[in-house]
């Protein structure tokens, strides 16, 4: 699931995904965070 959080590295997405979806599985794709459940 892509969330509206800008990123340059996956590490930036981990807290965002944890907050948004309760998952720490995150990637940075095309400058946006992507969370995996």
UniProtKB/Swiss-Prot annotation:
Subcellular location(s) of the protein: Secreted
Disulfide links within the chain: 7-28, 13-33, 17-35
SUPFAM superfamilies linked: Scorpion toxin-like
Tissue-wise expression: Expressed by the venom gland.
Predominant place of localization: secreted
MF GO annotations: ion channel inhibitor activity; potassium channel regulator activity; toxin activity
InterPro entries in alphabetical order: Scorpion_toxin-like_sf, Scorpion_toxinS_K_inh
Protein name: Potassium channel toxin alpha-KTx 2.19
Function as written in the Swiss-Prot or TrEMBL entry: Inhibitor of voltage-gated potassium channels.
UniProt similarity note: Belongs to the short scorpion toxin superfamily. Potassium channel inhibitor family. Alpha-KTx 02 subfamily.
Organism superkingdom: Eukaryota
GO CC, one annotated term: extracellular region
Transmembrane domains' residue ranges: none
Key words, A-Z: Disulfide bond, Ion channel impairing toxin, Neurotoxin, Potassium channel impairing toxin, Secreted, Toxin, Voltage-gated potassium channel impairing toxin
Site positions for Basic residue of the functional dyad: 27
Pfam families per the UniProt record, alphabetical: Toxin_2
């Amino acid at each position: 699931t892509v969330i509206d959080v800008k990123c340059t590295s996956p590490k930036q997405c981990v807290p965002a995904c944890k907050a948004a979806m309760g998952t720490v599985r995150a990637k940075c794709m095309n400058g946006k965070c992507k969370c995996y459940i």
